[in-house]
Amino acid sequence: MLAPIMDSSHSKFRIVILAPKGLRTGGPEAMHQLHHAIMQLGKNSLLVPLPGTRNRISVQQYSKYDPIWGEIWHTRRNDIVIIPESLGQLPLWYFFFISRQNLFLWMLSVDFSYENQFQKYETKNFKIHPAWLKNEQIKLRLKNFKAQKLIMKFFAMAKLQYVKFRNRYMRSRINIDFNNYLFQSAYAREVFRAINDTNSGVMLSDYTNFENKQKIRKPVFCTCTKKHIAYFPAKSLNLISLILDINASRGGLIHFIPIQGLEPSQVIALLSESDLFLDLGYFPGKDRLPREATSLNCPVLLAKRGAARFKEDFPLPSMYLLDLEKLDPESTFEAITKVLSKGKKFNSRAQSKFQEAVCAEKPLFIKEVDNLINLLNNF
């Protein structure tokens, strides 16, 4: 839907959200949720595609948020513009339509921020047990990567020269006032405040949209009698592969099932039927999959990395948070089997606070959005 240009007499300003159109991940969904909440609270809002995504098709699954898409030239200079943390520059001509002082940055993640001090923050500042780094598969991947790197070097250099030219002459770096930062997680808030020695910024989380999931007809995913562990191979596969090797060496007692190439109903079925959801990666923010898992009564076992180090983000008992700085792969596998031995019902009850926190996300988010609107009215 294309937004009409609103008359300034009806509203002092609109809240414009620059979002990647056509991308289905946690960040873009949060932006749609924000847009929807603002509209529900009676304030005008507009989604504007990030540069390079204008011609993409809007994600069909996000139609439930009633998105109103517009163009950058539909904005007014008194509009508030919210951008994601990964956006460090904008085309110069954008600033004919928007004001720099009205830019707000939403830190949906820490480690994927355009700002150098935040990039890969977790991996740079918190190491894992060296045994995780001795994986022969990793060495092979590095070898292959080096070979590919040589082949791609010429093309990369050409692209780099173009990017340098574009950034210098065609784009403008974005500098955000500390007071104009919004934080999706306690992890983002605390890292930002520690690095910048400030108490500035406002919390603006998101929520896990598990409404009506129970009404979806769930296919039977697996009928074997083994314990089932769901995992997301697109994240931390180099670590998970070591666990899979250990499991195979012990006769494959556990059935590890990847969340990969599945329809939404299949993901729901897998998480509903699994005894555990395992994630050994770092959490640049409050990742959705662990929250979706617990909303489907699937216990989680997470690496204590990134946002998982903060109780405010993941209120889990310590036995469900794996300290990979101390635990090697063998010890981690033992911890996994120990958790499984407790049984799904026990683990679910032990994680009741996490489940309650996830259930309370939406009303909390609406309250945060309402608070943000009130702050902006006095901006």
Where would I find each of the regions flagged by the language model?
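N-terminal pre-catalytic "stem/leader" segment of glycosyltransferase-like enzymes
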Residues: 1-80, 301, 308, 320-321, ...
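Extended catalytic core of nucleotide-activated donor transferases of GT-like folds
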Residues: 2-5, 16, 54-135, 139, ...
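Structural motif
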Residues: 18-22, 50-51, 82-88, 108-109, ...
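Conserved catalytic-core segment of nucleotide-activated headgroup transferases in glycan assembly
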Residues: 29-30, 163-267
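Alpha-helix C-terminal capping/helix-to-coil transition sites in glycosyltransferase folds
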Residues: 76-78, 177, 272-273
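Short acidic alpha-helix that forms the nucleotide-activated donor recognition element
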Residues: 264-274, 295
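Acidic donor-binding loop of glycosyltransferase active sites
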Residues: 272-285
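Catalytic binding pocket for nucleotide-activated donors in carbohydrate/polymer assembly enzymes
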Residues: 282, 288-359
